[in-house]
């Protein structure tokens, strides 16, 4: 395997699930996991890659149970958005402790806590080598953080959306329940839809497809995987318009 001397991506949008931050814990934020992820992002900054981040909120708030109990979906989604802001603040703090400049931008105004999302400002920050953490999803209920990741990725003209998961990429079947499941190296948008593979929700996926935004799914729990993806090594599954 030949290693490229420099990164194949100049600007990326990294999507982290909230659950990824909880480590082995069942809830909340695991400090060691948070620091490890901050170090992996720091490596990319040192390579000259511009990094935007979207983090989910599932480690702090899960609306499904409350929705079943009768909570209004809009209220639940607003609570979920605030959970992503909390994760964003934690990630910014971890990056600052690793001597990496980072800004948190929120799609809903939270004066005194973080910056309001502003497209031009986000681009300027990225160009200055700062990590920009986009929080509060899209700012609208009924949209997932995967949708927010694809939307922000398209807006900042990222080269790729990197979706960090607990498995090595996209498989023919669930690798947890089916040990014979095979890992796909590359997929087209159409084949993902045809095979009904669960990469992300349909709204997010079709947004990426319609704007020709490549998605790479990889395992963030694998040390060095993020760097390997950015350096163009074989890691995870690439989804693009190429058949």
Curated annotation (Swiss-Prot):
Key words, A-Z: Allosteric enzyme, ATP-binding, Cytoplasm, Kinase, Nucleotide-binding, Pyrimidine biosynthesis, Transferase
Catalytic activity, EC: 2.7.4.22
Catalytic activity: UMP + ATP = UDP + ADP
Compartments in which it is found: Cytoplasm
Top EC class for this record: transferase
Pathway in which the depicted protein is active: Pyrimidine metabolism; CTP biosynthesis via de novo pathway; UDP from UMP (UMPK route): step 1/1
Activity regulation details: Allosterically activated by GTP. Inhibited by UTP.
Function per UniProt: Catalyzes the reversible phosphorylation of UMP to UDP.
Assembly, per entry: Homohexamer.
Family recorded in the similarity comment: Belongs to the UMP kinase family.
Identification of the protein by name: Uridylate kinase
Species the sequence originates in: Aliivibrio fischeri (strain ATCC 700601 / ES114) (Vibrio fischeri)
Gene behind the chain: pyrH
